[in-house]
């Protein structure tokens, strides 16, 4: 436990494997270290190394952590489950506080204004959410690219998420007492759920 001026502060480990594989350590609201592996297919091989590298670079051991936050998707099943499982296991083993972040919210948090966020859902589809002044008003959903229309006055943000984004969003959300207790995976697809053919995004 990190103590500053006699007051307890968080040592938070953020983990995300929704696109690449990454881990980051925050002391309070300060980013201390990060480790990123961009390989979109090497999640299982890289997750342990990412966590280890981030902890070593921060000069701490896992036992000193107070919180773990995991990106919970939406993302394809194979990669997403790796980071989530690692985070849940670590938090349960060490009895740490565990938080979950929807990754489109994390991406939107790093932007300003009215935005539409999309990420690659594979199978020729997109994960989608719409935000007005930082508040999510639509999504998350799976959509077809041809169904994506960006309303006037909105910016389209299309990129993957990482552990730093997840951590920054979680810290800001927890400071406002936002409930991040949902740590269930968001796949938005299963064998018996068909994605929508298109999503007309209107203003």
Predicted regions and their residues:
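Oxyanion-binding and handling regions
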Residues: 2-31, 38, 42-46, 99-203
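Short, conserved beta-strand segments within well-ordered enzyme catalytic domains
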Residues: 24, 36, 67-69
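Conserved active-site region of classical short-chain dehydrogenase/reductase
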Residues: 45-48, 84
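Generic structural marker for isolated residues within well-ordered, non-membrane alpha-helices
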Residues: 51, 87, 104
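Phosphate/pyrophosphate-binding loops at sites that engage ATP/ADP/AMP, CoA/4′-phosphopantetheine
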Residues: 51-67, 151
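Phosphate-handling active-site elements
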Residues: 58-63, 91-101
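DPxDG-like acidic metal-binding loop motif
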Residues: 67-97
């Amino acid at each position: 436990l990190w103590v500053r001026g006699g007051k307890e502060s968080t040592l938070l480990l953020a983990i995300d494997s929704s696109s690449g594989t990454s881990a980051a350590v925050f002391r309070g609201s300060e980013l201390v270290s990060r480790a990123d592996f961009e390989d979109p297919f090497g999640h299982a091989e890289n997750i342990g190394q990412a966590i280890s590298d981030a902890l070593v670079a921060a000069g701490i051991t896992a036992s000193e952590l107070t919180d773990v936050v995991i990106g919970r998707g939406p993302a394809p099943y194979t990669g997403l489950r790796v980071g989530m499982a690692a985070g849940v296991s670590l938090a349960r083993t060490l009895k740490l506080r565990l938080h979950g972040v929807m990754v489109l919210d994390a991406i939107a948090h790093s932007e300003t204004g009215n935005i539409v966020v999309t990420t690659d859902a594979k199978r020729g589809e997109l994960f989608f959410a719409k935000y007005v002044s930082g508040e999510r008003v639509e999504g998350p959903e799976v959509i077809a690219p041809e169904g994506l229309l960006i309303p006037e006055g909105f910016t389209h943000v299309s990129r993957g998420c990482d552990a730093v984004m997840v951590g920054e969003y979680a810290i800001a959300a927890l400071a406002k007492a936002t409930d991040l207790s949902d740590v269930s995976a968001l796949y938005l697809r299963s064998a018996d759920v068909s994605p929508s053919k298109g999503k007309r995004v209107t203003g």
